[in-house]
């Protein structure tokens, strides 16, 4: 027994000394100086005598003792670069003085190093790593948050987001996210559970502000820096390559899940850490479901279209690109008419896209083109008919979220999508020749001083270019797997 304890102690000491920042991590993440400058930009936009508080995302459970892969809260990542759970960040408008005389204007509390835990669930950087790697001067373990003295009552405004209701309580851990939140609530006299809604919906009679932070962060995150644009370009290019490789490889009889797998293999091949959102791969009438993520159709029909809406997430930044292609490599006359109408609508919105324009105007432009075209095709009777076949807006910001924060009026260096679509479900009140046709074309754009730059042009958009690309050979055509069940003789 003594020998086992000694061995375990040596193992733990080894983990303590060697773990922290992984030597295998890429070195092209946003720099600590970049994140520090973002915190300063937020500070400059805050009111005098105010403080902003951010909590790391919760760890979310998949089932039983298996959790989902952790994904940091985008605001928290934007301001810190910290990618671990169980942390809280405080940013002060004005300098504060600690009991020991230290002057500071920001402070972060993070997950404490624990060698045994790291052996099971991965490296942590701890308070010292947060100082050395992320550039914080004031960084402490989460266990110190409860007793750290911040006189919240003196602030004119305490900015924070209201809390999610799915934060788990680990009763054996007094430094988990649940505990940090409860300790914060006690510090700021947060209303009891039955009164919590009044904090957000009524003019507060205290100094708690649950509304103001969103607008401040939207102002920052909506306009991308040079470094962010570089990461977005890479995420977009990776996603475009996925679309191109599917165009080359697709054959009738493939499954939706197989097509999804080709896209996501390309993402991983280029070191994209994650998907920006669940992949949408809808063959035929499944494309009429706007956010179809089942992707379980076992065999794609020779004569149908497939709508593919996917985005790689690279170093936190996500693309959002949709292409609709014919499974057999050739658009039918009806498919071509709908596709070219949607493309015409997108190009009209592209021309209208420039600084000073509201995002909603891009939808108006696309809708006018689509409605006129649907009347000409006899699919609807009047241009003012209810939007049965084009039920969504065409534009949103992209960045750390696929539907990123940002203000509605366009400015240079904003990154947005333009994504008109037409969806005609089976049994619609129109000629059956149109049934099951679903087309969406979605591209990513960078707003410039004069207009916009198409970021996702590597993936073909026109009928001619798509059909030409689908004639190209694919390396995946040689990739054959054995049958799981031998064919019966």
Q: What is each PLM-predicted segment?
A:
Residues 1-23:
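Bacterial Sec-dependent N-terminal signal peptides
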Residues 21-489:
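Active-site neighborhoods and metal-handling regions in enzymes and metal-associated proteins
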């Amino acid at each position: 027994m003594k020998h086992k304890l000694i061995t375990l102690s040596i193992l733990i000491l080894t983990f303590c000394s060697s773990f922290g920042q992984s030597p295998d991590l890429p070195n092209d993440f946003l720099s600590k100086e970049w994140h520090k400058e973002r915190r300063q930009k937020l500070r400059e936009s805050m009111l005098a005598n105010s403080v902003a508080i951010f909590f790391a995302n919760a760890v979310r459970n998949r089932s039983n003792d298996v959790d989902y892969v952790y994904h940091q809260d985008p605001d928290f990542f934007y301001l810190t670069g910290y990618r671990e759970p169980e942390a809280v960040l405080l940013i002060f408008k004005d300098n504060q003085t600690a009991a020991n005389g230290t002057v500071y204007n920001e402070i972060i509390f993070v997950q404490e190093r624990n060698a045994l835990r790291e052996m099971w669930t991965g490296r942590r950087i701890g308070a010292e790593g947060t100082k050395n790697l992320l550039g914080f001067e004031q960084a402490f373990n989460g266990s110190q948050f409860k007793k750290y003295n911040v006189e919240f009552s003196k602030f004119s405004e305490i900015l924070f987001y209201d809390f999610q209701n799915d934060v788990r309580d680990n009763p054996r851990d007094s430094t988990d996210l649940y505990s940090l939140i409860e300790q914060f609530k006690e510090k700021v006299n947060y209303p009891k559970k039955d009164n919590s809604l009044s904090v957000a919906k009524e003019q507060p009679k205290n100094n708690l502000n649950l509304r103001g932070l969103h607008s401040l962060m939207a102002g920052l995150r909506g306009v991308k820096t040079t470094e962010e644009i570089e990461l977005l370009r890479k995420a977009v290019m990776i996603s475009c390559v996925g679309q191109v490789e599917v165009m080359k490889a697709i054959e009738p009889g493939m499954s939706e899940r197989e097509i999804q797998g080709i896209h996501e293999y390309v993402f991983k091949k280029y070191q994209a850490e994650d998907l920006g959102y669940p992949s949408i791969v809808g063959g035929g009438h499944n494309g009429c479901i706007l956010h179809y993520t089942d992707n379980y159709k076992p065999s794609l029909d020779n004569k149908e279209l497939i709508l593919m809406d996917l985005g790689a997430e690279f170093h936190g930044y996500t693309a959002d690109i949709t292409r609709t292609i014919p499974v057999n490599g050739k658009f039918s006359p009806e498919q071509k008419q709908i596709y070219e109408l949607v493309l015409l609508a997108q190009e009209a919105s592209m021309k209208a896209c420039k600084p000073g324009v509201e995002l909603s105007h891009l939808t108006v432009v696309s809708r006018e083109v689509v409605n006129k075209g649907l009347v000409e095709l006899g699919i609807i009777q009047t241009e003012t008919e209810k939007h049965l076949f084009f039920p969504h807006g065409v534009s949103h910001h992209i960045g750390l979220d696929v539907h990123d924060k940002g203000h509605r009026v366009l400015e240079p260096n904003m990154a947005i999508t333009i994504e008109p679509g037409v969806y005609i479900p089976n049994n619609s009140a129109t000629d059956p020749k149109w049934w099951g046709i679903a087309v969406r074309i979605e591209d990513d754009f960078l707003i410039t001083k004069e207009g916009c730059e198409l970021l996702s042009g590597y993936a073909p958009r026109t009928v001619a270019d798509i059909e030409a690309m689908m004639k190209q050979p694919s390396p995946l055509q040689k990739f054959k797997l054995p049958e799981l069940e031998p064919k019966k003789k």
